[in-house]
Amino acid sequence: MSVDAATVRRIAHLARIAVTDDEVPHLQGELNAMLAFVEQLSEVDVDGVEPMTSVTPMQMKKRADVVNDGEIADQVVANAPATEDHFFLVPKVVE
């Protein structure tokens, strides 16, 4: 798969990132390099390899799975520009 300049501009638009025309070729190369690396990963033979969560064998410390509201909802939303009933209000982005 190859990314063209139009795709770079579309990705930037969807991500709400301002990209100049001078930056498009560089970003196009970066995205193509990332996709090429992912394609290489799909070719790796992983038969017989067990999934792992860490490169070092260690036991993870476990804690009780207890629902907790944190009791700081007012502090969490204190700096938000708009809130309602301890929820953040954000502009609609999907029509």
UniProtKB/Swiss-Prot annotation:
Its EC number is 6.3.5.-. It comes from the Bacteria. GO terms for molecular function: asparaginyl-tRNA synthase (glutamine-hydrolyzing) activity; ATP binding; glutaminyl-tRNA synthase (glutamine-hydrolyzing) activity. It holds the Pfam family GatC. One of its GO terms (biological process) is translation. Keywords: ATP-binding, Ligase, Nucleotide-binding, Protein biosynthesis. It is an enzyme of class 6 (ligase). The keyword Lyase does not apply. It catalyses: L-glutamyl-tRNA(Gln) + L-glutamine + ATP + H2O = L-glutaminyl-tRNA(Gln) + L-glutamate + ADP + phosphate + H(+); L-aspartyl-tRNA(Asn) + L-glutamine + ATP + H2O = L-asparaginyl-tRNA(Asn) + L-glutamate + ADP + phosphate + 2 H(+). Allows the formation of correctly charged Asn-tRNA(Asn) or Gln-tRNA(Gln) through the transamidation of misacylated Asp-tRNA(Asn) or Glu-tRNA(Gln) in organisms which lack either or both of asparaginyl-tRNA or glutaminyl-tRNA synthetases. The reaction takes place in the presence of glutamine and ATP through an activated phospho-Asp-tRNA(Asn) or phospho-Glu-tRNA(Gln). Belongs to the GatC family. Heterotrimer of A, B and C subunits. This is Aspartyl/glutamyl-tRNA(Asn/Gln) amidotransferase subunit C.
